[in-house]
Amino acid sequence: MNRNDRRRLKKTRRGARPKGNGPEATARDIDSSLGRIAALLQSGHANDAREICQSLLAENPDDPRVLNLGAIACFQTGDASTAVTLLETAIEHQPDFVDAHNNLGNVHKAEGDLLRAETAYRQAIQIAPMYFDAHYNLGIVLETMGRPAEARDSYARALDIQPDFLPGYLNTGNALKALGKFDESLEYYRWVLEVEPRNVDAHNNMGAVFYELRRFDEAESTYRKALEIESGHADTLYNLGVLLHELERYEEAVDAYQRAIAARPHYSECHVNLGYTMHRLGRLDEAEGAYQRAIELDPDSAQVHANLGDLYLSRGEPQAALALCDRFLDRHAGDTGMLAFKSIALREADDVDGTRALLDVERFLHTTELGVPTEFADLDAFNTALAEHICAHPSLVDAPASHATRHGKHSGELLIEPRGPMAAWEARLREAIEEYRAALPNDSAHPFAESIPARYRLTAWSVVLESQGHQIPHIHPSAWLSGVYYVALPPSVAASRENTAGWIEFGQPPDHYHGKLQAALSLEKPREGLLVLFPSYFFHRTIPFDAAGQRISIAFDVLPYRGP
């Protein structure tokens, strides 16, 4: 702190002392002190602001304004716990103190407690429906929680209040991208760039959309344009690395990841991808080092643990891979991604009984007829309405690069307005899910049965395949239960008995894993109106088919939900 700052602080401390007599003088003194505290916070002197707040609170422990600013000072000095306590106390004394609710949401958001952050922002909005900050912050939280449709709506309300707020347009584009509405998201990014041509985030996010659309040349040129603006932009370097890896330009990908890490050393996802690319290059020791660093940074990441376990498999060490799985699952019971990898590790460790128990298709793979909603005359009418809705859906695009679909189209979220026939489909699906949950064995020893979510939310999308279309082996790592409903099938697929082209297959992991033993496979023949439900950690794929006609299906996830 320089001499002028010390002089200013000394004056502020003097101003914080009570002056004059009577309540009016005290109120004026507090108002004056609060203004000085706010100025200190805005100028980056949080420690000094906190010290003055403590003095004021000693005389005025119930003043919500002092409690609120004291909380901000505590948070800015790294004391989130005290900040929460002060804000909750402020709200107790003044329940309609909208700034305190919003600030409480900010602290919870920064600490990763997104559910409490959501609650705080919604309370702020209930008190003051036109409160811009709460709408915008709520959008950020909802987007982080994987609820992009709600996030888009929150951003829209924020922009209705403050239409010139550029980050709101950028984030709306991100939410639309997550919803699979790529053309709309590009419009938002382009609008941002019209206003601010050197906005590196808009260039980077636009490149990510081009990547999803498999317009790889445009993606690369857009990323490089972003890097011309800011050569050390870590997120752009990371995305460039992903693209270069996809194009099998592995050495260039390594360079991009290393530059991203140099710009942001604690970028855990970048360490994961660097390890994965090193593994592809056969540089196993360097790959292991990258994975271990990622685990240090993010010990709760199932993906990096699975990648490290796969490295052990490539070295012929299945027991080490299995031990890694068990240690992780001891801390994260029922984690979908790790259960999927454990099924590989068990097989490679020659644990036949363990593999069969984890992948028990007899107990956990369930097929049923969805049933026709009363609004429709019969199954044909219902499926025709669904097919028309899907094929006209604005989010239906050629398969995004990050998805499992090949030679087909993929929609975004279908459970958003206008839902059309999807509303009746969802109602029937929820009934089927409840029947499935109720029929599960009461087996606390099995990780799938043990991790039944008390509450859940649904997400659904469509896959439209034509000749040669298929899905490569994959899982749904964020979900507990997944499934598929068949809307329409090519006649030859519907009529097939021995030819399994177009069927769904369970058991085969993706090619990038280094298992040597053949997985046990289970096949299900699709038929229009059939609903298939299965644990989200079951690897599954669609067998390619060569036939005229469309294979239209609706896939869905049951996502554990712990919201308000």
Please give the residue ranges for each predicted region:
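TPR-adjacent "capping" and linker segments in tetratricopeptide-repeat scaffold/adaptor proteins
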Residues: 15-32
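Amphipathic alpha-helical repeat scaffolds
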Residues: 34, 38-42, 54, 292, ...
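Conserved alpha-helical positions within TPR/SEL1-like repeat arrays
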Residues: 38, 65-76, 99-110, 133-144, ...
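Structural signature of tandem alpha-helical TPR/SEL1-like repeats
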Residues: 42-51, 76-89, 109-123, 133, ...
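Structural marker of alpha-solenoid helical repeat scaffolds
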Residues: 59, 93, 127, 161, ...
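Non-heme Fe(II)/2-oxoglutarate
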Residues: 355-449, 470
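Catalytic core of non-heme Fe(II) oxygenases with the double-stranded beta-helix
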Residues: 416-430, 434-533, 538-544, 549-564
